[in-house]
Amino acid sequence: MAMQAAKRANIRLPPEVNRILYIRNLPYKITAEEMYDIFGKYGPIRQIRVGNTPETRGTAYVVYEDIFDAKNACDHLSGFNVCNRYLVVLYYNANRAFQKMDTKKKEEQLKLLKEKYGINTDPPK
């Protein structure tokens, strides 16, 4: 066990690898317990969040205790078939999650600047 930990300490992982996985294309009726059965085989899990609103159905977040377990799960479960659906397993990216929000904020700021300087972008009639 100590030998394995020493080997892991020497491995450099890509920067996008982290302990949080984002899973898409899940069956809508999947439960957290079923997620634990599938993802728990790759290491101890700290938390699982399954989407239950119309916007988040079919998605989930899985947080592993160890980054190497998350990498192993991502490598092995991408494309895994669950109820005739092939899972899409990605590393969580905080920047991507807030990208839509940033776009709306920028559009609002642009609108305010246009109003401030009297710029009209409507096409001429």
From Swiss-Prot:
Q: Which Gene3D superfamilies match?
A: 3.30.70.330
Which ranges carry the RRM domain?
19-94
- Record-level GO cellular component terms: nucleoplasm; nucleus; spliceosomal complex; U12-type spliceosomal complex; U2 snRNP; U2-type spliceosomal complex
Which SMART domains does this chain map to? RRM
> Is Acetylation among the key words of this record?
yes
What Pfam families is this protein classified in?
RRM_1
Transmembrane helix as a keyword of this entry, yes or no, is no
* Cross-link Glycyl lysine isopeptide (Lys-Gly) (interchain with G-Cter in SUMO2): residue positions: K29
Its subcellular locations are: Nucleus
Molecular function GO labels? mRNA binding; RNA binding
Question: CDD domains, alphabetically?
Answer: RRM_SF3B14
- Which BP terms from GO are recorded? blastocyst formation; mRNA splicing, via spliceosome; U2-type prespliceosome assembly
Q: Which UniProt keywords apply?
A: Acetylation, Isopeptide bond, mRNA processing, mRNA splicing, Nucleus, RNA-binding, Spliceosome, Ubl conjugation
Q: Which residues are recorded with the post-translational modification N6-acetyllysine?
A: K29, K41
Indicate the quaternary assembly. Answer: Component of the 17S U2 SnRNP complex, a ribonucleoprotein complex that contains small nuclear RNA (snRNA) U2 and a number of specific proteins. Part of the SF3B subcomplex of the 17S U2 SnRNP complex. SF3B associates with the splicing subcomplex SF3A and a 12S RNA unit to form the U2 small nuclear ribonucleoproteins complex (U2 snRNP). Within the SF3B complex interacts directly with SF3B1. Component of the minor spliceosome, which splices U12-type introns.
**Main role?**
Component of the 17S U2 SnRNP complex of the spliceosome, a large ribonucleoprotein complex that removes introns from transcribed pre-mRNAs. The 17S U2 SnRNP complex (1) directly participates in early spliceosome assembly and (2) mediates recognition of the intron branch site during pre-mRNA splicing by promoting the selection of the pre-mRNA branch-site adenosine, the nucleophile for the first step of splicing.
Q: Which family does it belong to?
A: Belongs to the SF3B6 family.
Instruction: Please state what the protein is called.
Output: Splicing factor 3B subunit 6
Query: What is the source species?
Result: Homo sapiens
